[in-house]
Amino acid sequence: MNSTNLFSLAGKKGLILGIANDSSIAFGCARLMREMGAEVVASCLNDKARKFVEPHTQPLGIDLVNCDVEAEGELEAIVQHAVQKFGKLDFVIHSIAWAPLQDLHGDVVDASREGFARAVSVSCHSFAELGKLCAPHMPDGGAMLAMTYLGSGEVVPHYGLMGPVKAALESVVRYMSLELGSKNIRVHAVSPGPILTRAASGIASFDELMATAQAKAPLQRLVKLDEIAQLSAFLCMEAASGMTGQTIYVDAGVHAMD
């Protein structure tokens, strides 16, 4: 293989879910991948979100589609839209997480059955469903990435319900890596350090969480949106063809300090 192609995304076709605004991890990934020559279909939640997202995606040539993963048929519809547009998919990035605020801000033991189930459905099961929907349209193999966080494997104050939900997501990633490996589809969880996104703003005392992370980080700073996108782009390249089933940290080294 030409070594130049190993680190290229030119001509690759991708689906990226979860843009809320220009601070979203999903947007950072979509922007970088477009700059690197990939073609991208991306999602925002609904028409209300589109007003904030489209001014940033349209100039980049990103095809923006509404997708509420809780709404029957919408996840399947966006996959079909991308496949009809591109003919195939080479990479898929899932950057969606949600829980009802009452459950997110309370203790895990107090989480409602419905709130817990919805958090898992939106944040975790939707990635497994993406695997089912996208794998048949990835004839050349490729990569599927989901976004997670350190609080999946250790207790992070105020992260609450999302901790066990992200732990479930990371387990799904590992099982999907086995189930899709025969199709040459690589599956990873990317674990960024805290950055101020719309989703993160729902976490109680998030400013305190960021300050703690910065104080612990060997690099003595927080990770940047572009750095999360850079790791994600690499994992979608042929250069990462020997890797699958991992949770990979991009957090300025915070994970190594515990």
Question: Residue locations for each model-derived region?
Answer:
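Non-catalytic, hydrophobic alpha-helical segments
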Residues: 144, 227-231, 235
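Short-chain dehydrogenase/reductase
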Residues: 2-118, 202
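Catalytic loop of short-chain dehydrogenase/reductase
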Residues: 18-31, 97-136, 140-182, 194-196, ...
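Short, small/polar-rich loop/turn modules that mediate ligand/substrate recognition or access, typified
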Residues: 181, 186, 243-245
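A conserved structural motif in NAD(P)-dependent oxidoreductases
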Residues: 217-228, 239
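A glycine/serine/threonine-rich, flexible loop-to-helix segment
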Residues: 54, 182, 192-217, 227, ...
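Conserved SDR Rossmann-fold cofactor-binding beta-strand/turn motif
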Residues: 186-196, 236, 249-251
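Short C-terminal tail/terminal secondary-structure segment
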Residues: 244-258
